[in-house]
Amino acid sequence: MEFLRRRIETQVLSLTGLALGGIDYENPPGDPGLFGPASVCWRVHGDFTSMLVGGISALLLQALHPLALAGVWDHSNFRADLLGRLRRTGQFISATTFGSRADAERLIERVRAIHLQVTGHAPDGRPYAASDPDLLTWVHVAEVSSFLKSHLRYLGPTLPDHAQDRYYAEVALIAERLGARDVPRSRAQVDDYLERIRPQLRCDERSREILRILRAAPAPSALAKPFGMLMLHAGVELLPDWASELFGLPLTAQRRQLIRTGVRCTAPLLRWAVRNGSVHRAHRRMGLPPR
């Protein structure tokens, strides 16, 4: 049984930012980082399964914004190294949530510097810049709204409304530090923002290519392949209805229930197996009992 547990954990951690190294989540002792263990974002960001589903859904949602997608398309090797991009994104989220304050601030400054180099023109001729405050807000909202929605669906459905609002207020700090402006800080503000930005979104050939790349992404092992496909289906199923319609991905109620049941049956096994994720290491840094 211990062999199985370690095997599963190794497979899981190979998909995360921990595989990149460079962040010591267990030091310095007692450093709460930017948020600390009493924060809501420690609860929401601490579960691998719900974060993976939310991350896939966020990636698809972000791909509906032509300018945001153009920056990734022109300045990233995601088509050849999707796993690498997911790891780097995961590292940033984990380090800014669970890392020491010094590591979190270092990564924020690194990403800000990278964003300054990402400029160009979308296929329709419009200029874009990754440092554009409005684009940064879009990427942030697409991401954190997907994380929270996945958490509510697959881990913490009873998270109180006030805690959900607090989550948005907490993570707004990261977006603002990156240069975003007018960042929504509550459920009502997020809902209003998504409604206002919808006229700017569309599904084009590049958007559909993102979906094709996700579907064709190689699994790190034969053991992980069925799990990866389930997570992809769950990420698609998590999309807002209007986003699913843009992608042309209607799902029947029966199909939705099948996907959700699959995730809920799989998640407990992963939670049992993983004992050394970033959240576990951060708990050790803070001298807290194991999760």
Kindly label every feature range from the protein language model.
Residues 1-138, 142-291:
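Mature, function-bearing regions of proteins
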